[in-house]
Amino acid sequence: AYVDCPTREQRAWTGDSVVHQMIDLTTNTDWSLARWHPQLTATPRSDGMLPMAVAGEIEHTDISIIPDWALHWVHSVHNLFRYTADRETLTRLLPVVERVVQWFAERTDEHGLPVDLPGWVLIDWSAVHSDGANSTIAGLWGRSLLEFAEMSEWLGDGGRAAWARQLHARLADGFEQLWDPERSLYVDTLVDGRRRPMTSQHAQAAAIVGGLAPRERWPRLVEVICDETNLVHAAFARADGPSDPGTETELGGVYMYIGHPEPWWDTERQVVRAQPFFRYVVHDAIVLAGAGSRLSRLLLDWRALLDRCSASFGETWYGGTTCHGWSSTPTRDLIQHVLGVQPDAYEPGSLVIAPNLGHLDWIEADVPTIDGVVRVRVERGRITVRADHQVHVRSGSDSAHVMPGVTTVLPRTIIT
């Protein structure tokens, strides 16, 4: 199993592991654990919700649930679809995915928004309010519905795919209530039909990856996410001021019992930053919105974690453990988004290369695939590919069949 760190978190968490899995699929030639962990954690309760951690005392006692963790788990199943196209495994896992998305469907209001969810709605260790209907939960559920529909259709089940897309369309209509037209952003929560002013990077990113924000809004949402002048480090663990990097603010879930403290920051102007774990969603949203050239500089935020411990990434920007697997998103991003190499699930043995060099002049890496390792180098105006096996490579309008041991150049590709 994937565990988050060698100290207190030696548990098989259901949601955290999505980052660990993506690191494995991106950098490791042995995908056995990346394949196994989603199966290990596919142990739904009688109501369809997954335990927040499995194979231990948390699952045994069923002390609580983290609803959003099940949605990250769905994404890990979709990762298996994209990287392995393993029909047998996906056929076994898809009924569990269906039960997860159905669990949220059963807890929606008249507008199709999940509302007042039970358990611990964690999001991450940032101060993201989750009362009533929550933008981040809605966006993650939207992503899960789209992923379930895609995998169902791929397996030949058009009926379930249509069902999921109908739910998604209803959700997208209801999600409009979370749009603040005066500030041109999504707020975190809708309580008793009223938008509360708090907002976050999480809300904007989830709206994009969940397919809930109209495309014409995406550039504005990227601005909200990336505007350093308005971003704030805020955590419920510290109710009276910022939880900046280096403050060693203690983590704490006391708010689960006493409720969220009222915001101390300027909720009309400031946007709560995502912690390292949720940044994988933020970065996916930025790339999906066509702003991937920003990513190389955004990854420099991890310098704060290296200042705290030069050998590993810590749990949050402000404290917690000094070694936490869920904070390792840059390792994935440098391959998937900056180098831009990802598999084509619909054409086994093929790679899609969509680089985002940003401020870098070049990037080069050995990338594991289901058939073997491929070396890719990206420079301004040129992509070079070399493999020990035959592979089809596509980049924009350029494509090539790379033969074993032969270096192939894709010169016409425009690199941004």
Q: What is each model feature region?
A:
Residues 12-364, 371-373, 382, 391-397:
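Active-site core of glycosidic bond-cleaving carbohydrate-active enzymes
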Residues 376-378:
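C-terminal accessory/binding modules appended to enzymatic or scaffolding proteins
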Residues 4-5, 55:
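Short, surface-exposed recognition loops or helix-turn segments adjacent to catalytic cores
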Residues 384-386:
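Short edge beta-strand/loop segments characteristic of extracellular beta-sandwich folds
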